[in-house]
Design a protein with these regions (language model features):
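Active-site entrance/lid segments in N-terminal catalytic domains of soluble metabolic enzymes
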Residues: 1-110
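Catalytic alpha/beta core domains of metabolic enzymes, predominantly
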Residues: 94-132
């Protein structure tokens, strides 16, 4: 596809039928993907394989407590999704203006702001609140 690094998303959700997440992880590694964004359930079962193969992991979180767990299991970056981002499991209706500074204060790893950023003013606000 390209000789440049690229990323993919792996949403890990509970299902009635088994989902081949192990095969997805293998395809990500064998395909040379260097950045993965995970969402839904914890990426913990895949972290050793991703790390051993040089894959950077960004985990999408809707609460600081989820972000802290993501940091503990070794993700490289957390994407904090304020309520404005919409549609993510575990939402507690907390907006980005509250979540962004709470996450950046609690975490040692980089935090990316997600949701409610529509123009340069929103970007400046996210940066001012400590996001990268």
């Amino acid at each position: 596809m390209t000789d440049q690094p690229f990323g993919v998303n792996l949403t890990i959700l509970p299902t009635v039928r088994p989902t081949p997440y192990d095969e997805y992880a293998r395809a990500i590694i064998e395909g040379g993907v260097k950045i993965i964004e995970t969402a839904g359930r914890s990426p913990e079962p895949f972290m050793k394989r991703f790390k051993a193969n040089g894959v950077k992991v960004i985990h999408k979180c809707v609460a600081v407590r989820h972000a802290l767990k993501a940091e503990r299991i070794g993700v490289d970056v957390v994407s904090i999704d304020g309520f404005e981002c919409a549609g993510h499991p575990g939402e507690q209706d907390v907006g980005g203006l509250v979540l962004f500074p709470a996450a950046t204060q609690a975490l040692k790893i980089p935090v990316v702001a997600s949701g409610g950023i529509a123009d340069g003013r929103g970007l400046v606000a996210a940066l001012a609140l400590g996001c990268e």
